[in-house]
Amino acid sequence: MMAGFAQTTITKINQFYERWMPRLPAEMTARNVLVFCVVCLLCIGSVMVASASMPYAEYMHENPFHYVVRHAISIATAAIVAYLVYKVPLNVWFKNTFSFWLITILLLLAVLVIGTEVNGSRRWIRLAGFTLQPTEVAKVMMAIFTADYVVRRAKEVRTHWKGLVRLSGVMAITVGLIIAEPDLGATVVIVLMMVGIFFLAGAPPTQFAIMLGAVVMGIGFLILFEPYRLARAMSFTNPWADPLGTGYQLSNALMAFGRGEWFGTGLGHSVQKLSYLPEAHTDFMLAVLGEEFGFVGISIVIGLSFIMLACCIKIGHRALKHNFLRAGYLAYGISIIFLLQIIVNAGMNMGLMPTKGLTLPFISYGGTSLMMCAAMISLILRIDASTQEINPDREESNF
């Protein structure tokens, strides 16, 4: 029943495309629209990183362009990463999923040993003046692993408990290391992405319900038995109860939205970014954007993000339709990652969700996040280029 609902939803999205795309110019393919949205978001993000970070950079580094320069380097690096990822054939990714998973585990272990601790979390590895965040790499690698797994073990996934047990074991090892950092936000994204692919691959409703229930219980346990997480989870319901304590970030973010109204105060005229709103150029970039460009600016960014997401889903649906199962599930996994990051980041900025350290794709400052987002878009473009025609071969197990 649940798998049928998922397929019905995807079919509705595809029908929407088939109904409206013929009315648009031939150049407006899902691929071209996707690239257009990403470029627009990158441009908006670059402008907002400059606007939001300059006061903080001047205070911390005595150079207002400190984060602007680093962001420009990150964009250049992300472009190189995207090019290299695009050049790798899809079958190379899928034939080496276990090796990529082991590399991911080693990175997650390394960050616990040699990682840099910031605000009580050990999530970053310093490399030549820059930082690498292994959890961002884990999101992409686990999407590739899960997409391959549900095809390689298709019979087990759909008919036997072994499919659930094997995948749960891999999930437990991976998210266990991420929780140890700790990084609950990345944990939620990875777990829900894996559960989503498992569901779309046709898992029995009972297994899906058990897996989802275990995830919800696990997240609840992590929140309830860690005082700072519980305080953060509860503060979003009424940040004004403790505006100088647990509700400080959110109360300042809400004031930023309030000042922005419909059209904003103008580029560079944000008050909250002047040391009032912590992480203004990273997690709370949307609040600064709302203050400077108002509801209209927020609507444009969210609209572009969801159009980008719809293009990813469209490309994934066509891949499945043409019998490229691994590619299709990977596209859906990437779509789920983007969807969760957009919803959680926007939700926490607007006080609809607890505060979590998740960036807004292509908008927020963050080198590893930007590189991995570029890599995911590159994978989507590779899927689009590789699945234009119906797959003449039935996809088989890798081993």
UniProtKB/Swiss-Prot annotation:
Family note: Belongs to the SEDS family. FtsW subfamily.
Query: What keywords were assigned to this record?
Result: Cell cycle, Cell division, Cell inner membrane, Cell membrane, Cell shape, Cell wall biogenesis/degradation, Glycosyltransferase, Membrane, Peptidoglycan synthesis, Transferase, Transmembrane, Transmembrane helix
Spell out the HAMAP family in the cross-references.
PGT_FtsW_proteobact (MF_00913)
Specify the protein name: Probable peptidoglycan glycosyltransferase FtsW
InterPro entries cross-referenced by the UniProt entry: Cell_cycle_FtsW-rel_CS, FtsW, FtsW/RodA
Top-rank lineage group of the source organism = Bacteria
Q: What is its EC number?
A: 2.4.99.28
**Entry-linked NCBIfam families:** ftsW
Where do the TM regions start and end? 33-53, 73-93, 98-118, 127-147, 160-180, 184-204, 208-228, 293-313, 328-348, 360-380
Entry's Gene Ontology BP terms = cell wall organization; FtsZ-dependent cytokinesis; peptidoglycan biosynthetic process; regulation of cell shape
Sorted alphabetically, the Gene Ontology cellular component annotations on this record are: cell division site; plasma membrane
GO MF term set: lipid-linked peptidoglycan transporter activity; peptidoglycan glycosyltransferase activity
Q: Which residues lie on this side of the membrane: Periplasmic?
A: 54-72, 119-126, 181-183, 229-292, 349-359
> What's the top EC group for this one?
transferase
Q: Catalytic activity annotated for this protein? A: [GlcNAc-(1->4)-Mur2Ac(oyl-L-Ala-gamma-D-Glu-L-Lys-D-Ala-D-Ala)](n)-di-trans,octa-cis-undecaprenyl diphosphate + beta-D-GlcNAc-(1->4)-Mur2Ac(oyl-L-Ala-gamma-D-Glu-L-Lys-D-Ala-D-Ala)-di-trans,octa-cis-undecaprenyl diphosphate = [GlcNAc-(1->4)-Mur2Ac(oyl-L-Ala-gamma-D-Glu-L-Lys-D-Ala-D-Ala)](n+1)-di-trans,octa-cis-undecaprenyl diphosphate + di-trans,octa-cis-undecaprenyl diphosphate + H(+)
Organism the protein comes from: Acinetobacter baylyi (strain ATCC 33305 / BD413 / ADP1)
Q: Which Pfam families match?
A: FTSW_RODA_SPOVE
Annotated localization:
Cell inner membrane
